[in-house]
Amino acid sequence: MLRAIGLVYIVIFAGIIVEGQALVGPAGISPLGIYLAEVKKLLPGTIEAFFGAPSLFWLGQGAGLIAGVAWSGLAAACALVLNVWPRLALAVCWTVLLSFVSTWNKFSPAQLDGLMLEAALLCLPFAPPGIRPGLGVMSPPGPFVVFTLRWLLLRVMFESALVKLVSADPHWRNLTAMDVLYETSPSPTVLGYWAHQLPHAAHVLAIVFTFVAEFVAPLAAVFGGRRGRWFAFLVWSALQIGIQLTCNFGWLNTAALGLGFLLLDDRMLASAADKLGLRAASRFLARHATAPALPPTPPTNAASAASTRGANGAALVWQRCGRYGLRAALAVHFGLTLFHFARVCRLPVEDLPPVITRPEKFFAEFRSANGYSLYANFEPAHVQVDFEGSNDGGKTWRTYPYRHVPQQVDRRPPFTAPWFARFETTIEIESSKPPKSSVIPLVAAHLLARNPDVMARFASDPFPDRPPTVVRMRRHRLAFTDPATLRRTGHYWHKEFDDDFLPALHVTPQGDIAQFDLTAAETALHAGSFRTAFALFERDYQLGNLDAGYHLADMHTRGLGGPVQPEKAFALFADLAARGEIRALHNVGLSYEHGLGVAADLTKAAESYRRAAAQGRMLSLYALGVLAATDRLVPKNDIEGLAFLLRAGAMATGTDGAAAFVREEQPAHVKRLAERMSAADVAAARALALTPR
């Protein structure tokens, strides 16, 4: 088990060595020095500040120290795997990981890092003492030490089951969790893609198996004797292997699998080896399952005996103090874990007297007594921000390619676990969390500044010729395609544009990095100062702000500050559409449909609407459905038209005017189409509406 912990720590520190400078280095996204300065402002006292962020980096925040600390952690992890001074190695692993985890804020998922911190701390007294202790037969861990580690495993299992039942997320209770788990996990594998395609009944069986592994297995381990522990070990291991092969949750499942070996003892392993015909292994394990006899004590004279008794007496006192101190520390840790267990059970822990809750708050930032709620909640969709740059004023855009997480729709989902892509996973998590994260625009700023550490987190530099002057942050929704689509197109993912996460960043004429801000232009527009508004919009459009260009086209369309100029509006909309502005692409379709500034052409109208609809534009879906209902869709296809209307209606859930309009008008067009279609065609349209395109 200790070797497994060491292997996981090797993966952790290798990741920190690779990504640490980009994340928290002096020139990184969230520099340690800035973070610790903020902690110092909030907690002026030295001791208070340390307990607010327990870290070696109070000694310094330079790139050399960050690298040195990370490499020392890797060396300690290697020593643990090689069984060299395991207690010291565990202490170094815990100290180094805590130093990073307590200072890099959003780059530390609580479940992953917290589990490894708690495991390392509890393994300290479990590991045998000495530089080369072998299997530690001469100094086996005490019963309370073994109990605390098994208590950790049982909490990981049982709390994860319990939180699924009491969580506000209904997916586990209504047996639909596995219908969404694979698709919404940060980086599913190709096996996750195929698991997603299984029928709902298979997903229900997977849910039942999950609860057996997390709820029944710990009870069997506690009350079922050795057979119960074998059962718990096997189903728990199968669950962790299955999740790791389908979902890529970093080292989480590897660590949970390693902890599962705590359910076994040498006698159980010896018996299993014997039944499997592994005689040598069986004899070896049986030998070490029994404590060796102590060597005989040589005869001594009275003087030396008295001296020995004195020395032994002092040693016994120290041993007792150490033993009682360890028991007290483990008892405190056990008490702290009860707070987290109570929270999972939704008990009112915060209502307890401060004298009881104070220790838990005091040690909270050490993150070594935790609650575990694995896979309790699900995001409504797989959402991700892509960084796109332009070096020609927004005429063309190039995407910064990620290394691991889904982005290219035709890329086979890879196997990356136990490696944890901390940078990419953080971007994905922050893409959908309210309020909008400050991490994402900081990454965009570093890309404009050509920070080599941050740029190295991407698979390649899309601007080897000339650096970008604008970087935008475009949010997309991703959904798995079905096998038929995969065979036809080679696409594993369907990707829809959602919105711009924040206004784009650009390099000003003075060489500074700034965020596009249309406040002044919009204020002038609302005040009726159309000439001023036009000039401000035009300036930002020339810098690459497509939103400013859309305002310009809208002013031409409505005749604000001059006559209505549909030709100029269409030219602007067409230019914006070519640059990837989805609203403008819809308006190009509108112009072709109604002959606004261009000759009417229903074929080109449908083409533009389809391109916008493929990127998730609700109004374009609705427009295509209306064309079908009014017999103007080219080519004619009532099944597709009804599917467009149904998809538009499903998307019209917001409070904005466009959503309200679709909700009001869509039913009449649906009725009109459905009345002239056969029942089979209507069923086909409904199925098509539910299929990612």
Listing of model-derived features with the role each one plays in the protein:
Residues M1-D517:
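Alpha-helical membrane-anchoring segments
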Residues D517-A524, L536, G549-R558, L572, ...:
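Hydrophobic face of amphipathic alpha-helices that form TPR/SEL1-like repeat modules
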Residues L525-S529, Q542-L546, R558-L560, A578-E581, ...:
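Short helix-capping/linker turns of helical repeat alpha-solenoids
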Residues K636-D656, A687-L690:
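TPR/TPR-like (Sel1-like) alpha-helical repeat modules
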Residues G657-R693:
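Terminal, low-structured helical/coil segments at or just beyond the last alpha-helical repeat
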